[in-house]
Amino acid sequence: MTEVTELMRPEGEALNTKEVLLNLGPQHPSTHGVLRLVLQLDGEYVERVDPHIGYLHRGTEKLAESFTYTQIFPLTDRLDYLCPPSNNLAFALAVEKLLGIEAPIRAQYIRVMMAELARISGHLLITGALPMDLGAMTALLYAMREREMIMDLLEMITGARMHTSYCRVGGVREDLPDGFLPKIREFCEIFPNRIRDYERLIENNRVFLSRTQGVGVISATDAIDLGLSGPNLRASGVDWDIRRDEPYEIYDRLDFDVITREEGDCYSRWLCRVDEMRESIRLIEQCMEQMPEGPFQVDIPTIAFPVDKERVHCSMEALIQHFDLSAYGFDVPAGEVYSVIEAPKGELGFYIISDGSPKPFRMKVRAPSFVNLQALFGVTNARYLADMIAVLGSLDPVMAEVDK
């Protein structure tokens, strides 16, 4: 049999091979959005990958120039639509820097608690979606069960499950409703055991491990050179987290560990997100313990809407305040600012130029998914076509944030 096989194998120029271009997407379930990858293949090896983006471009940055600062919050919801509270927070902090104000302490605790709920929500999806992409369906069903609990909590606070628009310049839209804290405590008690369930599903799954361990390796040096951030950076051994290293809001009052891994492969990126969910639970519990009573937005009539909505119906001053802020907005001092937070996907930044009017002269969004997607150039060379799904899934891009 060996002799026959050797005789059948072509030699030299008799082996006729050629490079093939293959389109992956833009309609493909494993791209998790409208992303088109043009792959240059040599057999089953990926020699080159060219991401083609823009299928979900809505002109968010240009639209913002025609909106007042308050009206921009719904636009930020639609960047990383899996984690709207984080987007709201990053934008609010940028505008507050221009105004030279800070939200009340209670509002800061509420914002951080919402941001960590959003982090868990975003990580839950990729925790289940990456195994599903590689054939392990059960993890996604479990993850969606817990994510539904978070959606219920967000709906209880904001009235919306996805596009929450909860932050406001100078605070949050409204205070926590009655009965919310017991609900979130119940979630914090249940969820750590559920995380362990996900790990048990995966840690002995030989197919998932073989498809992710040692696949799509990004070294620490390459991760820094590519500008990666968030779990994709920390999974390569770079110990950097804006919440700790450049703290904003009340993160400097909270105790948490920055999760890092050394391997830099797809499995490490998955594990980083799983472990970060545990830390988010710790942060939420500390927020509930430390949160003081007090106002949930600044008491500046030219910036904040009336706290007591009933006054709008019986007070001329409150009605004028509400109408003026709704129709005209508020003037922001001329200047420019850049504000960045640690969003679930990485460093989310807003660069705003103000000309002194109620609308930004220019707004630029530093979207972490856009930057992280560049890592495809560095990790797919000489890899199998089948590995592309694992690599892309482990980077966890959201195309609405990429295309803006």
Swiss-Prot record:
Membrane-topology descriptor: Peripheral membrane protein
Molecular function via GO: NAD binding; NADH:ubiquinone reductase (non-electrogenic) activity; quinone binding
Location relative to the cell: Cell inner membrane
Signal sequence bounds: none
Major place of residence: membrane
Catalytic activities: a quinone + NADH + 5 H(+)(in) = a quinol + NAD(+) + 4 H(+)(out)
GO cellular component term, pick one: plasma membrane
EC code: 7.1.1.-
Keywords: Cell inner membrane, Cell membrane, Membrane, NAD, Plasmid, Quinone, Translocase, Transport, Ubiquinone
InterPro entries documented for this protein: NADH_Q_OxRdtase_suD (IPR001135), NDH1_su_D/H (IPR022885), NiFe-Hase_large (IPR029014)
Function: NDH-1 shuttles electrons from NADH, via FMN and iron-sulfur (Fe-S) centers, to quinones in the respiratory chain. The immediate electron acceptor for the enzyme in this species is believed to be ubiquinone. Couples the redox reaction to proton translocation (for every two electrons transferred, four hydrogen ions are translocated across the cytoplasmic membrane), and thus conserves the redox energy in a proton gradient.
Record's subunit section: NDH-1 is composed of 14 different subunits. Subunits NuoB, C, D, E, F, and G constitute the peripheral sector of the complex.
Family under the similarity heading: Belongs to the complex I 49 kDa subunit family.
Listed name of the protein: NADH-quinone oxidoreductase subunit D 2
Gene coding for it: nuoD2
